Amino acid sequence: MRKNCRETIPPSRNFLRLFRSRALQIVEFLFTKASEKMPLFVKKYIFAAKFCENRFQIMDELFPLVDESGKVIGSAFRSECHNGSKLLHPVIHLHILNHKGELLLQKRSQNKDIQPGKWDTSVGGHVDYGEKIEEALLRETQEELGITAFTPLFLRSYIFESEIEKEMVYTYKTFYEGLFQFDKNEIDETRFWSIEKIKENLNQNIFTPNFESEFEFLIANNLL
């Protein structure tokens, strides 16, 4: 299934993300300027702003829960999905290749709560509650690498289970030769790897377990 992703994030999501971003900037500014001499009403305002910041963060981390067919059956917060309860929730993976057949990998930030510092799929992220799979694919690709136009090819969906979570993974690939812009708080670096170089480094604690298992399946089935 091919679809040219040239749409933008729906206006409602754009507005909410912009509002959240601006609100958090204001909160951080107020906290850096806070002092003992500030009037009580100003301190109360800062406290309220900090409370709102926490609420925004919670709202931004609500995931859908699905059954094994992918049908949405409920919702849960990120912490609930990653605490070992094995609540099945959807994620997207995008594998990006260049004209040489090399595969782009991203090195996960040391700040990540799962598999910090390891090399991983080109793009990967959770589907937000109320969001469609292809909307999440576009959003995550824009957020992680700054890519706004690409043609994804659907490869497969499958269930991946680790010690702390259980995911319904929707896997895509695309070919892209442009520039990448990434948030260094989320990604340490990106690099194109040859397929042979990846094979040589499997099972060396360099890649995430999810990437390794997915890579081996895709190679074995000639999907990359």
Regions found by a protein language model. Give the residues of each.
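Nudix hydrolase/Nudix homology domain
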Residues: F56-I58, Y129, R156, E163-L224
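Acidic, metal-coordinating catalytic segment for phosphate/diphosphate chemistry
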Residues: D60-H93
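Conserved Nudix-box catalytic region and its N-terminal flanking loop in Nudix hydrolases
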Residues: E80-I92, N98-R139
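Acidic pyrophosphate-coordinating catalytic loop
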Residues: H82-L87, I114, S157-V169
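A short coil-to-beta-strand element that immediately follows conserved catalytic motifs
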Residues: T148-R156
